């Protein structure tokens, strides 16, 4: 039986359009995998970090799971190094700096956080 939200989807990072997110120095890019129309509850996608450092206060709960390389995050006076097979959970409101050299996937809740915070 098909879900009312549509079919199951297989998503390959190589098929997505990555958008600049940070750098220079370095480079950072993200690619949202599903639109808010398909999934307003969960935002999912991939990111590539190549030495850029991006400061941000997250407006959502976030999970980051590393596929290749080493992702780094500075938050709460801690420095986290996340390698393939590991993941981070980051609660809403965390002030942080993303960094490192990695390909990683992410999940955010709510997926439509920009709309909820008046940023769209």
Roles of regions detected by a PLM:
Residues 1-46:
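A short, N-terminal "cap"/entry segment at the start of jelly-roll beta-barrel domains
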Residues 37-58, 91, 108:
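Conserved short histidine dyad/triad with adjacent acidic residue
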Residues 40, 50, 74-78, 101:
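Short strand-coil-strand connectors
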Residues 48-49, 57-75:
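Short, conserved beta-strand element in jelly-roll/cupin
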Residues 63, 70-72, 79, 95, ...:
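Structural motif
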Residues 76-93:
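Short acidic-glycine-tyrosine-enriched beta hairpin
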Residues 92-117:
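Ligand-binding loop in jelly-roll beta-barrel domains
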